[in-house]
Every structure is written in structure tokens, then in C-alpha cells.
A protein has these predicted regions:
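HhH-family (HhH-GPD) DNA N-glycosylase catalytic core used in base-excision repair
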Residues: 1-294
């Protein structure tokens, strides 16, 4: 069993300026939150965020093609919120031929119906999360679990009784924190909606210190290089461990470096091994296990 990693205060102090330098650099490349920034009304942003975050797996260039087509339909339907609401009476046939990997058109239609039912019943994500998350909660995991439970229950059509009986493609859109999965896309949604600093939106009445880092292969690789974890599994426990160590760097906003760290990997600017032409200009080189002296 891997011993839990807890960085020292001195290590936190050493990491902080280099993470700040990385975070201050202009963002590299597109990001799924760009779809949410197309809209100004809160209901539109909430619906757009649910859709964009849920399909943000794999390469950005791959899933963005499907998202582009979905948001063309949404805009033609009066914007994401109005378009989703129309699914309460009729699915958009334009979704039928769309797909991304194992998520098929009927899964997307069910997802939009589910979102519409949620918005109608709960009045929006912000209203729901205000009830689901207490200031006393150590992190947002219980609130996210309640959100997933609510969405899963609303995904069932008449005659359906078990979420696990639904198609694999749809089930992939709604992972559960209690399953042990890192729930990267769910944590990314929470980051978008909670933090108020760019590029995030600050719509949820949740404290940033309760967020858990959206753990994917890029974040995991860089976190190991920085000594934020020794764990090799991309699990919820690993995400929590990395977040706890980031809290030693910034107790109030531990995942403020997530956007920059993720794009370090997404852009190809970190290969996980020393390549002088890549490592030398990197802001993290002095504190990286392979790029510098660690």
C-alpha cells in the first residue's frame, strides 16, 4: 500500500512561486469552458456547463466536434436553457445522428431530457447546491453525490427502474464519487461553477476550499513530478490527496492551479520525462523531479 503523501510547509513554500508563475501565463489552447462563456444568462450557462463538462473526455479536438454540433442545435432552439426545456415535450431529432465515442444520439437525447427535468424540479444547479453543500463539509464530495443521485433518478423514463439498466453511453455521463472514480468531469464542473477567478464563473454558493481537483492523466502526471502524490491510480483517493497537498499551498483556493497544470499536459508542454528544449523554459523546472533538481 502506498503511504499517503503530505508535503512539508517548506515544500509548499518552495512550490508556490513556481505554480504562481505557471498560472500567470496565458492559457494555451481551447478548453470546454469556452462553450459556457458563449452565454451570459445563468440558466444558459448552467445547461451549457452540464453538457460541455459531461463530454469532456479524451482529446479536446475529438469531443469539441460533437459539442460544436450540439450547441448549434441549442442556439437554434433559443439558447441552451430554452432548448433543453423543449425536450420535456419532444426530443430534438438533430441529436439522433450525433455521437462521441460510445455516447450515442439517444444517450444525448436522454441527457438533455434529464437536464430539463432537473432544472424544472430544482430550479437550477446553484439552487440545488446551496442545499446540498454545507459550509461545514470538508469537501464537496457529498454535495456532488447528491447532485448525481438527483440526475440519475430523473434520467429514468416511465417503466424504467434502475440506472444501471440504462445504456453504457448514458451511464458514462454520470459517474458517482462513491464509486471510487476520480469523477474528473464532475469536479471540473464544480470548479467552473464555484471559483470566481477567470476562467471560472463563480455561480455556486460553495467555498473554493471545498473543491477537489479534476484528476485526469495530465494532472496526475504533473502532480507526481511535483511530489504532490506517489499514488499510481487515477482514483478519488488520489484526487483528494493531491487536493490536500495543494491546500498546504493555498488553503482557501487549492485548485486555482488546475487550469494551468491541466493545459501543461494537454498542450504537450510536459512529456513526463526530461527533454531539454521543453523542460528548460518551464516555470516548474526548479521543483520538478525530472525537469530540474526537484
Amino acid at each position: 500500500m502506498t503511504t499517503a503523501t503530505r508535503i512539508s510547509r517548506a515544500r509548499a513554500d518552495r512550490l508556490r512561486p513556481h505554480l504562481e508563475a505557471l498560472a500567470s501565463a496565458p492559457p494555451a489552447g481551447p478548453d470546454p469552458i469556452d462553450y459556457v462563456h458563449r452565454y451570459t444568462a445563468v440558466p444558459d450557462r448552467e445547461v451549457a456547463a452540464l453538457i460541455a463538462s459531461s463530454l469532456a473526455f479524451g482529446r479536446v479536438a475529438a469531443f469539441s466536434g460533437t459539442l460544436d454540433q450540439i450547441f448549434v442545435l441549442a442556439d437554434a432552439g433559443g439558447g441552451p436553457a430554452a432548448w433543453a426545456a423543449s425536450a420535456l415535450t419532444q426530443d430534438d431529432p438533430g441529436l439522433q445522428p450525433l455521437f462521441y465515442r460510445w455516447v450515442r444520439g439517444p444517450d444525448l437525447q436522454r441527457w438533455v431530457r434529464t437536464i430539463a427535468r432537473f432544472m424544472e424540479k430544482h430550479g437550477g444547479l446553484s439552487v440545488f447546491m446551496k442545499r446540498a453543500v454545507s459550509p461545514r463539509d470538508k469537501d464537496i464530495s457529498q454535495g456532488l453525490a447528491q447532485l448525481v443521485d438527483a440526475l440519475r433518478s430523473l434520467a429514468l423514463d416511465p417503466g424504467e427502474h434502475e440506472f444501471q439498466s440504462l445504456p453504457r453511453g448514458f451511464r458514462h455521463l454520470l459517474p458517482h464519487p462513491k464509486s471510487g472514480s476520480a469523477c474528473k468531469r464532475l469536479c471540473m464542473l464544480a470548479r467552473w461553477m464555484t471559483r470566481s477567478s477567470a476562467p471560472d464563473l463563480g455561480l455556486w454558493p460553495v467555498s473554493p476550499h471545498q473543491l477537489v481537483i479534476p484528476l485526469d492523466t495530465h494532472i496526475h502526471k504533473v502532480a507526481r513530478l511535483l511530489g504532490l502524490t506517489r499514488r499510481t491510480d487515477g482514483s478519488w483517493r488520489t484526487a483528494v490527496e493531491i487536493t490536500r497537498n495543494l491546500r498546504r499551498i493555498d488553503a482557501e483556493d487549492p485548485i486555482r492551479y488546475d487550469f494551468a497544470l491541466a493545459h501543461l499536459g494537454i498542450s504537450g508542454a510536459c512529456k513526463g520525462r526530461r527533454i531539454a528544449s521543453i523542460c528548460e523554459p518551464c516555470a516548474l523546472r526548479p521543483v520538478c523531479k525530472v525537469g530540474g533538481i526537484g
